[in-house]
């Protein structure tokens, strides 16, 4: 399922979305870092809590890492590996994505459940055209 348009995210932005896997609704985050689009489950590896603590902030202030807002675990954006904090060496659960026809798609077997929410300029904006679509 399509979760976003490729053009929805500028460098250093994040986009939160819900998806269904094995009958469970889970939360994911799509980030653009160094030109790459990457997707992870929105779940810290230290404790099973959202990285953003509900405020849709994923990047550190300097924009170089992803960070868990609860206990400060810091993750390398391109690999998902924790480089500092209580779960050092653990890896965020990556979500397989593909880019086709100008859209970012979740892998087969994972379905988008709700429209994406993009983090931009200190506020979250609900995306009008990036919600779940039937294939």
Label each PLM-derived region with a short phrase.
Residues 73-74, 81:
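Short Gly/Pro-enriched loop/turn and capping motifs at secondary-structure junctions
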Residues 1-62, 76-77, 91-135:
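N-terminal pre-ligand scaffold of iron-sulfur
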Residues 44, 68-71:
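Short cysteine clusters
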Residues 58-68, 82-90:
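Short cysteine/histidine-rich metal-coordination sites, predominantly Zn2+-binding motifs
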């Amino acid at each position: 399922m399509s979760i976003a348009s490729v053009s929805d995210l500028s460098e250093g932005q994040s986009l939160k979305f819900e998806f269904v896997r094995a009958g469970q609704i889970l939360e994911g985050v799509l980030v653009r870092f160094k030109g790459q689009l990457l997707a992870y489950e929105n779940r810290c590896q230290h404790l099973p809590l959202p990285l953003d603590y509900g405020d849709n902030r994923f990047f550190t202030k300097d924009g170089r890492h992803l960070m868990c807002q609860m206990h400060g675990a810091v993750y390398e954006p391109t690999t998902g590996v924790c480089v500092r904090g209580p779960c050092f060496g653990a890896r965020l659960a990556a979500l397989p994505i593909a880019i086709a026809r100008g859209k970012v798609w979740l892998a087969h077997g994972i379905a988008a459940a709700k429209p994406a929410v993009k983090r931009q300029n200190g506020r979250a904006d609900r995306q009008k055209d990036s919600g779940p679509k039937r294939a």
